[in-house]
Swiss-Prot record:
Record-linked Gene3D superfamilies: 2.30.30.30, NusG, N-terminal domain
Limits of the KOW domain: 130-161
UniProt keyword list: Transcription, Transcription antitermination, Transcription regulation, Transcription termination
Organism of this sequence: Buchnera aphidicola subsp. Acyrthosiphon pisum (strain APS) (Acyrthosiphon pisum symbiotic bacterium)
The family this protein is said to belong to: Belongs to the NusG family.
One protein family per Pfam: KOW
Protein name: Transcription termination/antitermination protein NusG
Annotated function: Participates in transcription elongation, termination and antitermination. In the absence of Rho, increases the rate of transcription elongation by the RNA polymerase (RNAP), probably by partially suppressing pausing. In the presence of Rho, modulates most Rho-dependent termination events by interacting with the RNAP to render the complex more susceptible to the termination activity of Rho. May be required to overcome a kinetic limitation of Rho to function at certain terminators. Also involved in ribosomal RNA transcriptional antitermination.
Subunit structure: Monomer. Interacts with the transcription termination factor Rho and with RNA polymerase.
Amino acid sequence: MHESQKKRWYVLQAFSGFESRVAQSIREHVKLNQMEDLFGEVMVPSQEVVEIRGGQRRKSEYKFFPGYVLIQMKMTDSTWHLIRNVPKVLGFIGGKSDKPSPISDKEVEIIINRLRKIGNKPRPKTLFEPGEMIRVNDGPFADFNGVVEEVDYEKSRLKVSVSIFGRSTPVELDFRQVEKN
């Protein structure tokens, strides 16, 4: 393998569910072997999501590419061997097993822009849209059906038109009080 002058982006396949641990392990191996000058960023593109389970708000992580880790590095024999010896790394994606192909700068730019756009704001796991039918499962309107009029993700609340005695009545409900129909 020849040494290229600039760091390029490569895609690693890792055991699914271990992407973050693999990324951390790579960072530790790089530091331990004093190869920081040959490596750049190690990324697991993901977004924090908020879901409501059992009435409790829980944060979890949604990975855009489950089972994959992006790594910026100069490809040399020593860097290739370092990565291949990290536990739970299955190998590089693209090219031949002994000579992986980097992904294009344009592809990386698209991923990074997408991550920048979503920022650090957690998004709800369940997304509601105006006009969507829902069923109320809690509170005074339990077991009624309704139509979503407005969605407020900041407050996790919905404005819903519920049909009561044949008349459409607007009510405000928490995400926890409704389910998709």
